[in-house]
Amino acid sequence: MGNCLYPVETLSLDKNGTQFTFDSWNYSFEDNYSYELSSDYSLTPAAPCYSCNLLDRSSLPFFMLTSVLGMLASGSILFAILRPFFHWQICPSWPILAELAVGSALFSIAVPILAPGLHSAHSTALCNLGYWVWYTSAFAQALLIGCYACLNPRLNIGQLRGFTLGLSVGLWGAAALSGLPVALASDVYNGFCTFPSSRDMEALKYTHYAICFTIFTVLPLTLLAAKGLKIALSKGPGPWVSVLWIWFIFWWPHGMVLIFDALVRSKTVLLYTCQSQKILDAMLNVTEALSMLHCVATPLLLALFCHQTTRRSLSSLSLPTRQASQMDALAGKS
């Protein structure tokens, strides 16, 4: 919206008259030329509205710290899942968990590319690649969590290796295609990787906003509604609720604010005050920062999910199985 360090000089009208001058704008007119108005108008609403970008160059430490913590956490949980002595039988959902860890790691790698203040990294190609990896990894994680919640109660997809592989390829392919609009619409402007104002790119930007709203906002609401209906109608368990659903808390506001911003840009929703526009710009920055934190939280959610699944699997061992193991031990001693 502009540079918040240099607010605009607003014009004021004398309430007792109908004249205003441009002396404060350093315009020199011969004989101090003035304009006559037929009525008392206020020019303040016509002044440009300048908003402060919260994610400017001063936020570079936040970007870098989030990236480092995300890569360390994602790498640690991925190593724990893929190590040879991991309890794959006790936690059969490990392929999905590994993909979520990979998605979180990819997002963490993309964060420095889009970090403000790193001018050396701000080439157009890197900007496009950064946004593509950023949103492709996020879309893939959302789709994996949603499909896992819907299909696992019926199919136990962790046990079906071929089905899991095909599902993963399809979901990652859909996520990669969904990330193309934002990659094509992004560019470098004044040292920042952003979406430049261009009518040629508006279709791509609106497509991206719609995809984000559908995946980040509509998908979790659909899961909650389906779960509620299944419980209310007593027609089966419905989507499997797990700690992984917390992931959507980091992205749900981002989808909501993006679609609202799209409505404002398309003049479908009108903001009549500069303060409203400033609040919207601030919310765009806040929700983007919140979504970035998911790369740190996701590995923790995966670790908690593995812990809960392991405890559930161990407690589900039948008593006859335990007794049989004890009898085998006694027979070996005799």
Swiss-Prot record:
It comes from the Eukaryota. Signal peptide: none annotated. GO terms for cellular component: early endosome; membrane; recycling endosome. Changing L221P: In strain: BLG2/Msf, C57BL/10SnJ, HMI/Msf, MSM/Msf, NJL/Msf and SWN/Msf. It is found in: Early endosome; Recycling endosome; Membrane. InterPro entries: Duffy_chemokine_rcpt. Expressed in liver and brain. Keywords: Disulfide bond, Endosome, G-protein coupled receptor, Glycoprotein, Membrane, Receptor, Transducer, Transmembrane, Transmembrane helix. GO terms for biological process: chemokine-mediated signaling pathway; inflammatory response; regulation of chemokine production. The chain crosses the membrane at residues 62-82, 94-114, 128-151, 165-185, 206-226, 243-263, 286-306. Residues 1-61, 115-127, 186-205, 264-285 are extracellular. Glycans are attached at N16, N26, N32, N285. One of its GO terms (molecular function) is G protein-coupled receptor activity. Disulfide bonds join C49-C274, C127-C193. It is a multi-pass membrane protein. Atypical chemokine receptor that controls chemokine levels and localization via high-affinity chemokine binding that is uncoupled from classic ligand-driven signal transduction cascades, resulting instead in chemokine sequestration, degradation, or transcytosis. Also known as interceptor (internalizing receptor) or chemokine-scavenging receptor or chemokine decoy receptor. Has a promiscuous chemokine-binding profile, interacting with inflammatory chemokines of both the CXC and the CC subfamilies but not with homeostatic chemokines. (Microbial infection) Acts as a receptor for the malaria parasite Plasmodium yoelii in mature erythrocytes but not reticulocytes. This is Atypical chemokine receptor 1. It comes from Mus musculus (Mouse).
